[in-house]
């Protein structure tokens, strides 16, 4: 798919997250994000029980001359929540967007490496992007429902994939799926914990919902195409605390049936909802990847400890 | 090309209805020609084409065409279209010439409104595994529709009152008493394109040319008729505006929750 849309590379391309601390204290070297610390492979190696859903090997991404992601390898277990944390500009969103090939839409981006979904290479030249994105859904940072009714937002994906037929032609041929559509809309909205709030106004425009409701609608829209993996790019960063906690509950609920990969700026959020956490630090480097408890209680890397205790970033 | 003497001197105009029908058909035909072409070109230029020298060149050419004097479009019609459309001035030639005049504005405004559709919609749709063309059809174009219609309204306002090119390509039937029967003129034929319409290839009256002929060129004896025709022309244009604004309101309502 060759997109001509000139999407600006995400803010992650700008390395603005690092703050070199100008101080005379002897610990200045270690409190800054850029210490001389060498990343060890065993920090990034995470042993887990259960099946691997996504397997990433030696992934590099360049935006023009900017090396946004450096040699990242990690395996993501099935039916769990994997949090990606790190300061802005560390490449975590870039990494997330590689998992469903959304970076293909950025012209300047060059991607090298391998991403396998259940053993199938997604960067295969013959890979079917439509199938891939049906299996790996995505929820964006700011809620982006279509300017259509709530019902149309949910059924948009299945209709475009031909799973639901509606309209004049379908009616003429007696293959109108209005009933199935109704069931799908109800099921998806219930999964996204939005049904109670909108069941009486499904034909209203989705832009009339609050930000938190819009974001849950986007999650429902993503669930309607029945994905296996859900990628979330800071889904709660534009929302108030109550809406955020609803999204967090939802993520935990979803992890029973789906593999969730979530990028977040909020470390408490990562600690609350995720099973394992990957820490990216400045320069597009994966520094540590382990059980969330291990990362937050006893990280191997000094820089990761500094980051999660708030010394920089 | 057979240039007819424009007005048979001394003849009385055959009423105003043929002119009203002529103008309505001209505008409808021009819109049917220019809108699909203009919107299609805008989609290609904004969504598919590499942004570069080619698109810049098209943009300059479009702007230049939009400010080209209408008589030049008329001459293009007389010299290029008419010989290819049976050799006589005709309603179809008039429609095409007005369509070519409408095309640049439709293209410019469609491009602007397609560019204004937020990329978030395109991202959201792509992330659902929907192809680019389906996204354009179901998300981008509906969101751009009000802007496209605004362009068509502006353009129709210009072409409905256009006189100079019509003098050259529409032909003179000031004294016609019957309006062109476009709908009744369709008939099936045995060879491709299997459909023909003789009414489109006949000359027709139109409101602006009739105003010009009666008031400025001094054809016929009653100037009142010219003023009345001018008034009717205004009404017809306002009716087109009303249709356009209603359509735009409908599409805006669909997009907004207010």
UniProtKB/Swiss-Prot annotation, chain A:
Gene3D superfamilies named among the record's database cross-references: P-loop containing nucleotide triphosphate hydrolases (3.40.50.300)
InterPro entries, A to Z: AAA+_ATPase, ABC_transporter-like_ATP-bd, ABC_transporter-like_CS, P-loop_NTPase, PstB-like
Pfam families reported in the protein's UniProt record: ABC_tran (PF00005)
Chain coiled-coil ranges: none
The protein's role, per its UniProt record: Part of the ABC transporter complex PstSACB involved in phosphate import. Responsible for energy coupling to the transport system.
Subunit note: The complex is composed of two ATP-binding proteins (PstB), two transmembrane proteins (PstC and PstA) and a solute-binding protein (PstS).
Protein name (record): Phosphate import ATP-binding protein PstB 2
Species, as recorded: Haloarcula marismortui (strain ATCC 43049 / DSM 3752 / JCM 8966 / VKM B-1809)
């Amino acid at each position: 798919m060759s997109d001509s849309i000139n999407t600006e590379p995400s803010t992650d391309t700008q390395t603005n997250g690092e703050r070199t601390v100008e101080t005379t204290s002897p610990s200045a070297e270690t409190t800054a994000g850029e210490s001389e610390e060498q990343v060890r492979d065993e920090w990034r190696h995470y042993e887990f029980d259960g099946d691997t859903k996504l397997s990433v090997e030696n992934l590099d991404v360049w935006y023009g001359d900017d090396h946004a992601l450096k040699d990242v390898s990690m395996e993501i277990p099935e039916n769990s929540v994997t949090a990606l944390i790190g300061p802005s500009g560390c490449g975590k969103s870039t990494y997330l967007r590689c998992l469903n090939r959304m970076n293909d839409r950025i012209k300047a981006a060059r991607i090298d490496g391998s991403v396998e979904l259940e053993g199938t290479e997604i960067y295969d030249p013959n890979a079917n992007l439509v199938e891939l994105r049906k299996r790996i859904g995505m929820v964006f940072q700011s809620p982006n429902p279509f300017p259509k009714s709530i019902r149309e937002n949910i059924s948009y994906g299945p209709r475009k994939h031909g799973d639901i037929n509606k309209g004049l032609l379908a009616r003429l041929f007696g293959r109108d799926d209005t009933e199935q559509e109704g069931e799908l809309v109800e099921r998806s909205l219930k999964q996204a914990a939005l049904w109670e709030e909108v069941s009486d106004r499904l034909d209203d425009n989705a832009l009339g919902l609050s930000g938190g409701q819009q974001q849950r609608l986007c999650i429902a829209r993503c669930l309607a195409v029945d994905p296996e993996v859900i990628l979330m790019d800071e889904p709660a960063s534009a929302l108030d605390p109550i809406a955020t906690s609803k999204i967090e509950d939802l993520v935990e609920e979803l992890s029973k049936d789906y593999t969730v990969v979530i990028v977040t700026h909020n470390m408490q959020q990562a600690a609350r909802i995720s099973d394992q956490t990957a820490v990216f630090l400045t320069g597009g480097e994966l520094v540590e990847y382990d059980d969330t408890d291990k990362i937050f209680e006893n990280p191997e890397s000094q820089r990761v400890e500094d980051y999660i205790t708030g010394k920089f970033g | 090309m057979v240039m007819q003497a424009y007005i048979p001197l001394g003849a009385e105009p055959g009423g105003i209805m043929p002119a009203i029908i002529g103008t309505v058909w001209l505008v409808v035909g021009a819109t049917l020609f220019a809108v699909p072409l203009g919107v299609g070109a805008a989609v290609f230029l904004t969504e598919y084409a590499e942004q570069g020298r080619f698109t810049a060149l098209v943009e300059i050419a479009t702007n230049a065409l939009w400010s080209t004097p209408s008589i030049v479009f008329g001459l293009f019609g007389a010299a290029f279209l008419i010989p290819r459309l049976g050799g006589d001035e005709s309603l179809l030639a008039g429609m095409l010439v007005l369509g070519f005049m409408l095309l640049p504005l439709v293209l410019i405004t469609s491009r602007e409104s397609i560019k204004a559709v937020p990329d978030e919609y395109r991202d959201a749709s792509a992330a659902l595994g929907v192809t680019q063309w389906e996204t354009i059809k179901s998300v981008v174009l509906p969101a751009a529709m009000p802007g496209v219609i605004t362009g068509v309204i502006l353009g129709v306002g210009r072409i409905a009152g256009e006189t100079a090119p019509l003098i050259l390509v529409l032909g003179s039937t000031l004294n016609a008493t019957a309006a062109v029967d476009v709908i009744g003129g369709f008939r099936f034929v045995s060879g491709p394109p299997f459909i023909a319409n003789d009414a489109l290839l006949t000359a027709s009256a139109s409101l602006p040319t009739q105003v010009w002929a009666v008031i400025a060129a001094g054809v016929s004896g009653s100037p009142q008729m010219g003023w009345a025709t001018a008034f009717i022309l205004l009404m017809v244009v306002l009716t087109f505006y009303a249709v356009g604004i209603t359509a735009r309101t409908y599409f805006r309502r669909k997009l907004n929750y207010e």
